[in-house]
Curated annotation (Swiss-Prot):
UniProt-listed Gene3D superfamilies: YggU-like (3.30.1200.10)
InterPro entries in the cross-refs: DUF167, YggU-like_sf
Gene Ontology CC: cytoplasm
Family: Belongs to the UPF0235 family.
Protein name listed in UniProt: UPF0235 protein Cphamn1_2066
Top-rank lineage group of the source organism: Bacteria
Length: 101
């Protein structure tokens, strides 16, 4: 089950990123985290930027509302999205976690 924490008007959750994929997309859930394939390589923060763009587009929030708070140099990342409650976040992300690509 996806682990989401709500604090001070923001939600926090984990991402497992797979850079250099053929397509940028949310592919499901992995051990309480959101599994994300990213087309960008893990060079000069390109994959992190692509991850934030993908999440902002998927959740319908501004790119500036999405921030990687830890794990910028690894596959496992902790992400903060400002302006969503845990309920809103779960409603928006669930269709992407449990649908076929």
């Amino acid at each position: 089950m996806l682990q989401v924490q709500e604090k001070a008007g923001s939600v926090f959750f984990s991402i497992k990123a797979q850079p250099r994929s053929s397509k940028s997309m949310i592919t499901g859930e992995y051990d309480g985290s959101i599994k994300v394939n990213l087309k960008a390589p893990p060079v000069d923060g390109e994959a992190n930027l692509e991850c934030c763009r993908l999440l902002a587009r998927t959740l319908g929030v501004a790119r500036s509302s999405v921030e990687i708070v830890s794990g910028t140099r690894g596959k496992m990342k902790r992400v903060k999205v400002f302006g969503l409650s845990a309920v809103e976040f779960t409603e928006k992300i669930t269709p992407y976690l449990y649908s076929s690509p």
